[in-house]
């Protein structure tokens, strides 16, 4: 299990960072981790290419602004500040890889009329490419999760990759002294509630899923209560998190665009609709 000694918190100076920073500070204190506050200056384009001389000026002004940002919120922590130029998602991923970052923490940024359905492109890039776990909060300002999580739910999809995810979740919850629950969601059979035969088939599917997850849990050597829910995956995960008062969801990223298990293909939806922050492993 990794020792979480370096947290990266990318900053774009948006209001969302003010809602996320209490979590960052709490995690850093609990894990005794260094925090790097990082801002990325995106390329300025004119005509056929970028204008590097403007980027240099922007780096200087961004660095000055970064030095003034969140000073009170991170007081007493081990903090470094970094400014890079380039495409934000790429620069965040590269910095994390080159500087032994153990955890990236960042709010999501979806904009426009579809904000409730989207996560920002930068967050999506980091989720897809980062080598380390990524903590995200789609609605940190409205969420009421405890900054030090005491209740964690690990969403497992029933594939062999779930074994390592369970082990990771058990170890991570131990850092915080948090309780851990396992959750698996099986999709509903169409109109199953209307027909006795379909209800029986649905219960058989639920029990087969329970047996499959139980076998994986045994392989993982994890002692945690397990729930198998039936319903649309994103909605069922959000509902369970609300009912259990979860402070943190744990999901497996895998290859977010690949068909490696239903929960992985629904990762973005789970993040966007979760009532609490999500860490993607």
Give the label of every model feature segment.
Residues 25, 71, 124, 170, ...:
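Active-site phosphate/pyrophosphate- and oxyanion-stabilizing loops and adjacent acidic/basic residues
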Residues 1-3, 53-57, 71-104, 218-249, ...:
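Structural beta-alpha unit
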Residues 3, 26, 30, 93-142, ...:
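Gly/Ser-rich helix-loop-strand patches that form or flank binding pockets
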Residues 36-38, 80-84, 135, 181-183, ...:
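General small-molecule cofactor/ligand-binding pocket signal
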Residues 17, 79, 114-115, 162, ...:
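Glycine/Thr-rich phosphate-binding loops of Rossmann-like dinucleotide-binding domains
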Residues 54-64, 199-208:
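A short acidic, glycine-rich active-site loop
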Residues 1-56, 150-199, 218, 225, ...:
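Small/aliphatic-rich secondary-structure junction motif
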Residues 140-150:
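Intrinsically disordered, low-complexity Ser/Thr-rich linker and spacer segments
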């Amino acid at each position: 299990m990794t020792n979480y000694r370096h947290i990266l918190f990318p900053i774009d100076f948006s209001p969302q960072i003010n809602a996320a920073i209490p979590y960052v500070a709490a995690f850093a204190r609990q894990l005794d981790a260094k925090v790097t506050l990082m801002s990325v200056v995106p390329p300025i384009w004119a005509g056929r290419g970028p204008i590097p001389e403007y980027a240099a000026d922007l780096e200087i002004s961004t660095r000055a602004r970064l030095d003034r940002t969140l000073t009170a919120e991170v007081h007493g922590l081990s903090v470094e500040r970094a400014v890079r130029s380039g495409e934000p998602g790429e620069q965040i991923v590269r910095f994390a890889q080159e500087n032994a970052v153990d955890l990236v923490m960042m709010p999501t940024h979806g904009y426009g009329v579809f904000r409730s359905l989207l996560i920002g492109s930068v967050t999506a890039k980091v989720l897809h490419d980062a080598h380390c776990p990524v903590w995200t909060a789609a609605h940190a300002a409205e969420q009421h999760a405890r900054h030090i999580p005491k209740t964690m739910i690990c969403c497992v999809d029933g594939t062999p990759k779930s074994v390592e995810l369970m082990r990771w979740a058990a170890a991570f919850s131990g850092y915080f002294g948090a309780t851990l629950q396992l959750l698996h969601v099986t999709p509903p059979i169409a109109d199953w509630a209307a027909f006795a035969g379909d209800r029986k088939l649905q219960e058989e599917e639920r029990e087969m899923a329970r047996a499959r997850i139980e076998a994986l849990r045994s392989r993982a050597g994890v002692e945690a209560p397990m729930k198998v829910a039936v319903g649309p995956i994103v909605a069922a995960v959000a509902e369970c998190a609300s009912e259990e008062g979860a402070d943190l969801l744990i999901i497996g990223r895998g290859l977010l665009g690949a068909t490696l298990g239903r929960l992985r293909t629904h990762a973005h939806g789970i993040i966007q609709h979760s009532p609490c922050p999500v860490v993607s492993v």
